Amino acid sequence: MANAFGGGTGGPESDSSTIRSFFMFLERLSSATGLLGGLVALLVLGSAGAAADVTLTHVHGLAWSADGARLFIPSHHGLAVYENGKWSKAPGPAHDYMGFSATRARFYSSGHPAPGSGLVNPFGLIRSDDGGRTWKKLGLEGESDFHLLATGFATDAVYVFNHAPNSRMQSAGLHYTLNDGLMWKKATGRGIEGEPTSLAVHPEDPKVVAVGTRDGLFLSTDAGDTFRRLAAGQTLAAFFDLDGTHLWSAGHEGKPTLHRIDWKGGSAREVALPPLTEDAVAYVAQNPARRDEYAIATFKRSAFLSRDGGKTWAPIARQGQGVDRREGPQASKP
């Protein structure tokens, strides 16, 4: 069995024609690297702080502000923000953010600078302490662009999957830092099967990390050195609930699926999804201020909010088009 973090190839595709067709669809939407973590995209936005028509086309993450008031979607042309039922452009540079992830008080990202910014391309690892208005370089600029990047909400632990060696990582694979990139450690990744498609870090324990592949969802409790299979089947998105007990996993097995898994006990609950046609969940996020509120974004560029723990979902974007809506009771059910 190939180790996905040691340069091995992914496992065989499913015999199901439905799954093969779906992966062909995903591959058409994926970025040039072939990772499924990027949604092909364009953002058409008004001026910062003003209501605007928004068309979503590369969505490279999904995260709330620390106060829970704003939902951010990063892309090739800066950050789009959903606040009080309205879409707008978030203040800050129009960088091409990749691997965007949030902690309690910070944003972390990789990607490419906006044209004319004069910054080195690619970013390596960058950090924002002010909601994306300004960014600090944390190293590896001009060397690495991390499409798979995840952070620990309360710890600021950063895990990345790099495709090639760089000045701080002697080999490709899974690496992590606990001090904002001053020192990186290599994770062995034993037990992983298949090509990585998603990455998640426990909110409080930096040693607990999950990796999704086409062959399953894999969990490590020793900082990525060894993994055990937590769930079978392709995993397109992974996200640790802020309660630290549950892990969200999205896939497609004849239909789009979303599960909330007790990663210690192993029990799983299927979460009902809104109607999705030839689509699946690509990102999951939880509001840190109102923890029954979740957001999902899909590969076909739709986005939904739930304020009841995933029982019902209200659309805030449909197939790339932002939907401005009045705040209040949710209007759509699965």
Name each region found by the language model.
Residues 59-60, 95-101, 144-151, 194-200, ...:
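Repeated scaffold domains used in trafficking and secretory/extracellular systems
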